[in-house]
UniProtKB/Swiss-Prot annotation:
Ranges for region Adenylyl removase: 1-464
The species this protein was found in: Bartonella henselae (strain ATCC 49882 / DSM 28221 / CCUG 30454 / Houston 1) (Rochalimaea henselae)
SUPFAM superfamilies in the record: Nucleotidyltransferase (SSF81301), Nucleotidyltransferase substrate binding subunit/domain (SSF81593)
Descriptive protein name: Bifunctional glutamine synthetase adenylyltransferase/adenylyl-removing enzyme
EC numbers, comma separated: 2.7.7.89, 2.7.7.42
Catalysis: reaction(s): [glutamine synthetase]-O(4)-(5'-adenylyl)-L-tyrosine + phosphate = [glutamine synthetase]-L-tyrosine + ADP; [glutamine synthetase]-L-tyrosine + ATP = [glutamine synthetase]-O(4)-(5'-adenylyl)-L-tyrosine + diphosphate
GO biological process, alphabetically ordered: regulation of glutamine family amino acid metabolic process
Annotated region (Adenylyl transferase), positions in chain: 468-974
Gene behind this protein: glnE
GO MF annotation list: [glutamate-ammonia-ligase] adenylyltransferase activity; [glutamine synthetase]-adenylyl-L-tyrosine phosphorylase activity; ATP binding; magnesium ion binding
Top EC class for this record: transferase
Matching Pfam families: GlnD_UR_UTase, GlnE
Domain of life of the organism encoding this protein: Bacteria
Cofactor: Mg(2+)
Stored InterPro entries: GlnE, GlnE_rpt_dom, NT_sf, PII_UdlTrfase/GS_AdlTrfase
Length: 974
């Protein structure tokens, strides 16, 4: 027969200070109030047991507080051993629901009282050396199961009585109820630690005859689980029973608390992650329909235990290691503040050492399918997988670390695994471990951590590392790994917990891009490089959020992840897009197909000339015949090529001027092909006009080959026909004016209508004769007459940028010849100056600059450069050429017009503005705001102009604007 606990030889503990005697007096006083005379007498005696209690009171604030309030917990220990008393408590718990008058409030109170007593007794037995850590864990697990069981039985009976479910046996409500509760982690393994959460997953056996309508059952059982959480977890005046955690269930962010078995099986077989396989090793039915629970685990068997170790399985297992791996050069093992569970050399590494080898060999060796860590170490040795020395050192280390873990938690009954930084609290842990001074404890602790780390590091010593020794990157389960948070902050992330959540979501397979195991494997391998690259940006969290949005829209991720893994330069480019260019990031988020163009190895070596783009377009449209398909293909092609031109700008492969040529060449091709397609379809329906010819003039920046990303296109559609023509010759004939009006409208719709494949170009027809008051399609005769007799000078200025881009080639030549003749008119220079100045004032009032970075409308900005260039053309300072850019015109200005220094200044200003505006228009949808600038955009802008900071750039822009404006006023004598 075992001795009563308070008469047993207990481990001598060193007290923290001399306060223990006073605390014992407080217990004695409370015991006297409760008439516990035997206990009062015992506490008054001197002896090793009293000295033990004295020390405990100084070392554990939690135990001290509970014992002072509840000295009755000690009374039975005068007569019985702790295990006997614990058995009585467990029995009391299991019988609570037998009381027919029980209700939720009394159940909660009874559970909390019984649990608190058991909790204290287990701690005393553990600290006194009566229990090993294994026995303590077993009792804690039994306590958890008893509490869960009685609470669930109460809820099942209540639901049955209210007609929500139909039990087969009210007296034994768990039997065949169809509700499965699996204990996971340490609870499933029977290794619950002192202040542990209990990890649970709840399933519904939809095949059970007692589960009715599945949708209703999900609702009923999920509500039942919420009440179970309240009964067990909610803190009341009596405390709490256990904290419950249901986040290990499949896709916890989007699934109910109670999940149908078939749904779960589909998830595990199709989207189950590496860590979920490992987690299921310890899964065990702990409450509810246990028979159905064991059947579920049998069905899950092939997912967890793979019979043949193929390459995919090995990669899967390696992926777990990569997700949990603590890199060798990251930090140092320490004592104060070290995480005993998740830190280097900690409990998690021992558990992973075992679980990895279980996953590798458990499919072939049934002996390796056990749940308990120490037992599996023994089996690994027995099968020859590890040496006797490895087994013994890891068993010893595991015991030591579990004991340390328990004592950390006994300080304040908190689920923490971190050794205190506070010297007094750290000393308390050392003394609770039985040490008489801290140095010996620290020495043994560090030695243990180093032993574990050594075995863990050797687990896959020949495996290729991920290549970046940057620290812990653990994104398994639902908890944030403390060392991972440290790593993320070190990399440059401010909201490390949010980044962990994003990475867990990616690894969970909730997005299409990460649903396949192969994609998640590639992502795991890419993660260190990805996070390092994003962390190096100025606002890493914002960049990571954009990347997350991008992946949400990606239909498949494996190709992208593989591409980024094998092409670091592409990863750098993706990071640059996410960090500097919200507009491009938005494009690839909604149209991820544009990123396909990055597969082209010549992307940065070949400039996007018109010939280059024409060849690409012909190849892209090969075999595409129908009207809608051609338009959709054009939209996809335009999106991709605009994106790739933008990438070349970001990369520095092309200047702003060359980008203008490239964007314009693309627009020319797209508009010409769109018009040809529209015209063919229109002719099929309505026929043709006799002698009819159409030509389209590009105006504005399209005409002068200076388009930017996102530019509108200014167009004028002109036509001519035979004099005797009246109506088209098709099945649905139209009169001439109606015909060309509708043709123009069809063209505008084809270019500017937003479809699922995007939009080609926003179209502006306002530069046509009479603007919005005039017809959308203009006859050549009216055009000729208008510009020769009625047009304002500003319309002649605009005509200097006219260029034929689509339609009948002979007619386009005729149109351009007419433009040459109109520009060649003799004009009064003073009238032109007056018109330019009036327009300048009008624009300044109607559309003033938004800020200092409004490079177009600011004083001395792009608009003033264009005024100077257009003025020089229509006053014949230089010879007019169709398609000449503003830069070309400024370069050709003669010294008789401006001195060479001014001409050079204008040309330099245009280059500065063009480079900056191309980048800004590429990266942003809205005007640039220095207070809300994307993190990487400032670096791009600085790089483009060679300045060290944005204040210098602003100063440069301001000085350049002042210079240009002064030249403008000199030219206009204004």
């Amino acid at each position: 027969m075992k001795n009563a606990f308070l008469k047993t030889q207990l481990l001598p503990l060193r007290p923290l200070d001399e306060s223990g005697s006073q605390w014992l007096k407080d217990i004695t006083e409370q015991a006297r109030k409760e008439n516990l005379e035997s206990l009062v007498s015992s506490l008054s005696n001197q002896g090793k047991q009293i000295n033990f209690l004295n020390a405990v009171m100084t070392l554990s604030p939690f135990l001290r507080e509970v014992l002072i309030a509840n000295p009755s917990y000690l009374s039975p220990l005068l007569y019985v051993d702790i295990e006997t008393r614990l058995s009585e408590i467990i029995e009391d718990i299991t019988l609570i629901d037998k009381n027919k008058s029980i209700h939720e409030t009394t159940l909660m109170a009874a559970l909390r009282r019984k649990k608190r007593e058991a909790h204290v007794l287990i701690a005393l037995a553990d600290l006194g050396g009566v229990f090993t850590y294994e026995i303590s864990c077993a009792w804690l697990t039994r306590l958890g199961e008893a509490a869960l069981g009685v609470a669930l039985r109460f809820l099942l009976r209540e639901a049955h009585d209210h007609g929500k479910i139909n039990l087969s046996n009210r007296e034994d409500p768990e039997k065949d109820c169809g509700l499965i509760i699996l204990g996971m982690g340490k609870f499933g393994a029977g290794e619950l630690n002192y202040s542990s959460d209990i990890d649970l997953i709840v399933f519904i056996d939809e095949m059970s005859p007692h589960v009715g309508n599945l949708s209703e059952s999900i609702d009923v059982f999920s509500k039942m689980v919420r009440r179970l959480i309240r009964i067990i977890q909610e803190r009341t005046a009596e405390g709490y029973v256990f904290r419950l955690d249901f986040r290990l269930r499949p896709d916890p962010g989007s699934t109910p608390l109670a999940l149908p078995v078939r749904t779960a099986l589909r998830y595990y077989e199709g989207r189950g992650q590496n860590w979920e396989r490992a987690a299921m090793i310890k899964a065990r039915p702990v409450a509810g329909d246990k028979s159905a629970g064991f059947n579920f685990l049998k069905e899950l068997f092939p997912y967890v235990w793979r019979k043949y170790l193929d390459y995919a399985a090995i990669a899967d297992i390696h992926s777990i290691k990569r997700q949990i791996h603590a890199y060798k050069n990251y930090d140092q093992i320490s004592a104060y503040g070290h995480n005993i569970k998740l830190g280097r050399g900690g409990i998690r590494e021992i558990e992973f050492f075992v679980q990895t080898q279980q996953l590798i060999a458990g499919g072939r060796f049934p002996q390796l399918r056990g749940r308990q860590t120490v037992a599996m170490l023994a089996e690994l040795h027995r099968l020859g997988w590890i040496s006797e020395k490895t087994r013994d050192s890891l068993v010893k280390s595991y015991a030591f670390l579990r004991n340390v873990e328990h004592r950390i938690q006994m300080l304040a009954d908190e689920q923490t695994h971190i050794l205190p930084i506070d010297v007094s609290q750290f000393t308390s842990v050392a003394y609770l471990m039985g040490y008489q001074e801290t140095n010996s404890f620290i020495c043994d602790l560090l030695k243990t951590l180093q032993v574990v780390e050594k075995h863990y590091a050797a687990l896959f010593e020949n495996e290729q590392e991920l290549g970046l020794e940057i620290g812990n990157l653990v994104f398994t389960g639902e908890e944030d790994d403390p060392e991972t948070l440290i790593t993320l902050r070190r990399l440059g992330f401010e909201r490390a917990s949010d980044i962990c959540r994003i990475m867990r979501t990616l690894h969970c397979g909730r997005y299409k891009s990460t649903q396949s195991a192969e994609a998640r494997e590639r992502l795991t391998e890419l993660t260190p490089a990805l996070l390092k690259a994003f962390g190096a940006t100025k606002r890493a969290d914002e960049v990571m959020l954009r990347f997350d949005s991008f992946l949400q829209g990606l239909p498949s991720g494996i190709q992208l992840f593989s591409l980024l893994q094998s092409n670091p330069s592409l990863l750098d480019m993706l990071v640059l897009i996410m960090g500097a260019a919200p507009r491009l990031a938005e494009i690839i988020t909604h149209k991820p197909h544009v990123f396909d163009g990055m597969l082209d190895p010549t992307i940065f070596s070949e400039l996007p000339t018109k010939t280059y783009l024409k060849n690409r377009l012909e190849y892209f449209l090969e075999g595409v015949i129908s009207y809608e398909e051609i338009l959709d293909h054009l939209r996809v092609f335009a999106d991709e090529q605009r994106f790739l031109i933008g990438i070349r700008i970001l990369n520095g492969a092309i200047t702003g001027k060359k980008a203008g040529f490239a964007f314009t060449a693309l627009a020319d091709l797209i508009i010409a092909k769109t018009f040809a397609t529209v015209q063919e379809e229109f002719s099929r329906l309505h026929g043709n006009i006799k002698g009819g010819r159409v030509g389209i003039l590009g105006m504005g920046k399209l005409g002068s080959c200076e388009l930017t990303a996102g530019s509108d296109v200014d167009l004028i559609l002109l036509y001519e026909h035979d004099e005797d023509a009246e109506i088209s010759d098709g099945g649905k004939p139209l009169y001439i004016f109606q015909y060309y009006t509708r043709l123009t409208q069809r063209l505008v719709a084809a270019l500017s209508t937003l479809t699922s494949q995007g939009i080609l170009y926003a179209v502006d027809l306002r530069l046509r004769p009479l603007g919005n008051k005039g017809p959308v399609a203009v006859s050549f005769e009216f055009f000729r007459k208008y510009y020769r007799k009625e047009a304002w000078i500003w319309e002649h200025l605009a005509l200097t940028r006219a260029r034929g881009i689509a339609g009948d080639l002979d007619f386009l030549q005729k149109l351009e010849n007419e433009v040459y003749e109109i520009i060649a008119f003799s004009r009064n220079k003073k009238d032109v100056i007056k018109a330019v100045c009036e327009m300048h004032v009008l624009i300044g009032k109607g559309k003033p600059p938004e800020n200092r970075w409004d490079l177009k409308r600011m004083p001395g900005g792009i608009m003033h450069l264009e005024f100077i260039a257009q003025f020089a053309l229509i006053t014949h300072v230089i010879v007019f050429q169709i398609g000449a850019t503003t830069a070309d015109i400024l370069t050709q200005l003669p010294n008789s017009f401006l001195n060479q220094s001014f001409i050079s200044d204008l040309h330099h200003a245009y280059g500065l503005y063009t480079n900056l505006s191309q980048i800004i228009r590429l990266c942003l949808n809205d005007a640039l705001d220095l207070n809300n600038m994307p993190p990487g955009l400032s670096d791009l802008l600085l790089s483009s102009v060679g300045e060290p900071d944005l204040l210098r750039v602003e100063k440069l822009i301001e000085e350049t604007g002042q210079l240009v404006y002064s030249i403008f006023k000199q030219v206009m004598k204004y």
